[in-house]
């Protein structure tokens, strides 16, 4: 069970980093996310690896103009064992 928890933590950390990269590529600041209904603090937590629901992921993907499939591609168990490159 602890192994699954560690993989979950690594997955959401990698997911948060990927969301942050996409946000920056689209030219949005964290403050810009307020207009989409997210507080800066909540957005910071997502990008820091806070677990999110599928519904939240889909909403974020809509905002960032991508798909959930594209965002999570490569974030399987093998990927989250390696450090994320920037």
Where are each of the predicted segments found?
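Short, charged recognition helix plus adjacent turn
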Residues: 1-10, 72-86
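DNA-binding alpha-helical recognition surfaces that contact promoter or target DNA
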Residues: 17, 21, 35, 45, ...
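Short, basic-rich loop-to-helix N-cap that marks the start of a DNA-contacting helix
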Residues: 49-62
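The DNA-recognition helices of helix-turn-helix-type DNA-binding domains
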Residues: 40, 50, 75-79
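Intrinsically disordered, low-complexity basic tails/linkers immediately adjacent to helix-turn-helix/homeobox/MYB/SANT
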Residues: 64-71
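A short, Lys/Arg-rich alpha-helix, primarily the initiator
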Residues: 1-25
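Short alpha-helical DNA-recognition segment
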Residues: 25-44
